[in-house]
């Protein structure tokens, strides 16, 4: 997902962020920043060597495979990364709301409320697994080292809860506001992978994964975590899921043999008609539009057996500009007050 300016971009102790992707953007689930699609590498890629040691991303719940997960940003009105944090009681409420429908959630940082979330899942025996994040900033080696160390500690301390670890979020795509050195990212990925038993990945936009240079990164991960937003890429609603399916297939051809998990996709329910987002979003936002996209996406994903994390669980009012219509605030399937939007009303888990 050029992005709406992030006011809180440099806050330390960040957790999630919102995938819907800015300069040291706080680790919250966030839509990928918009960018014009560019061509994939012209030459057919050489398939990677047989990865006999590749770890399998295989979420299970009650002995059955789990296909769909959701990005979880826990911050409510008056809360934000860096504090104040949600209370343990609020986190428990959220997890109880999510558990009937989703068997896995995605976090974007190893700090902030992340351990509270993992501990709550463990102590309350809530059957949700977590893709844990390690937020990698562009020019903060100390913070990055802390994120990596905490991700390793949490993955080893909560092995039943941590399903996988994603090291970095949208750090390589050309439009990223927190673009990181590729060699350092690869080193962080290798450090985490050598220290935990879970499968390891990094998340990025399709406009990185479709480039030849992405193979350097793809070679060191266990699976590819892909972001693709039809809404941010000037698609109309009727073509949103077909566009997303075509995008996934193009990345599959670029990286044959590497499993793909959809890390972020979604549809916003409000936008600021006077904001920068209208340069990239050409389709209407709204609850009925989100409901249609969510229904069509989940149906397609089930038919295609495509694992995914939908973006996102709850609206997050702290994000983006001060304008309450700011699109970054309105990607949740639930309102900030935890009431379901139209996409979930009357729909069985």
Kindly label every feature range from the protein language model.
Residues 65-146:
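N-terminal carbohydrate-binding/catalytic regions of secreted carbohydrate-active enzymes
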Residues 173, 177, 228-232, 256-290, ...:
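Active-site clefts of carbohydrate-active enzymes
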Residues 22-32, 40, 44-64, 77-82, ...:
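Aromatic-rich peripheral "rim/lid" segments of glycoside hydrolase catalytic domains that contact
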Residues 59-65, 95-99, 115-127, 150-162, ...:
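Acidic (Asp/Glu)-rich catalytic clusters
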Residues 18-19:
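C-terminal motif of bacterial Sec signal peptides marking the signal peptidase cleavage site
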């Amino acid at each position: 997902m050029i992005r709406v300016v992030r006011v809180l971009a440099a806050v330390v102790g960040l957790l999630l962020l919102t995938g819907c992707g800015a300069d040291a953007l706080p680790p919250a689930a966030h839509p990928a920043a918009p960018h014009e699609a560019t061509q994939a590498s012209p030459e057919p890629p050489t398939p990677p060597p047989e990865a006999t040691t590749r770890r399998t991303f295989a979420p299970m719940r009650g002995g059955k495979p789990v296909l769909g997960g959701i990005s979880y940003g826990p911050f409510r009105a008056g809360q934000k990364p860096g504090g104040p944090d949600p209370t343990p009681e609020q986190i428990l409420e959220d997890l109880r709301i999510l558990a009937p429908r989703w068997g896995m959630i995605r976090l974007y940082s190893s700090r902030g409320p992340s351990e509270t979330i993992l501990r709550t899942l463990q102590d309350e025996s809530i059957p949700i697994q977590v893709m844990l994040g390690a937020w990698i900033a562009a020019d903060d080696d100390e913070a990055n080292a802390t994120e990596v160390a905490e991700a390793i500690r949490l993955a080893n301390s909560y092995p039943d809860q941590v399903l996988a670890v994603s090291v970095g979020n949208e750090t390589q795509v050309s439009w990223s506001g927190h673009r990181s050195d590729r060699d350092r990212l690869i080193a962080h990925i290798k450090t985490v992978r050598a220290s935990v038993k879970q499968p390891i990945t990094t998340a990025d936009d399709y406009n990185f994964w479709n480039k030849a240079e992405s193979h350097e990164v793809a070679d060191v991960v266990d699976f590819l975590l892909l972001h693709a937003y039809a809404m941010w890429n000037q698609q109309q609603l009727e073509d949103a899921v077909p566009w997303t399916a075509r995008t996934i297939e193009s990345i599959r051809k670029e990286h044959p043999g590497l499993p793909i998990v959809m890390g972020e996709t979604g549809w916003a329910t409000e936008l600021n008609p006077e904001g920068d987002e209208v340069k990239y979003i050409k389709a209407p936002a709204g609850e009925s539009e989100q409901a249609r996209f969510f229904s069509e996406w989940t149906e397609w994903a089930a038919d295609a057996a495509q694992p995914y994390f939908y973006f996102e669980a709850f609206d997050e009012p702290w994000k983006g500009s001060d304008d309450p219509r700011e699109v970054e605030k309105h990607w949740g399937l639930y309102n900030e007050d935890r009431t379901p939007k139209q996409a979930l009303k009357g729909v069985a888990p």
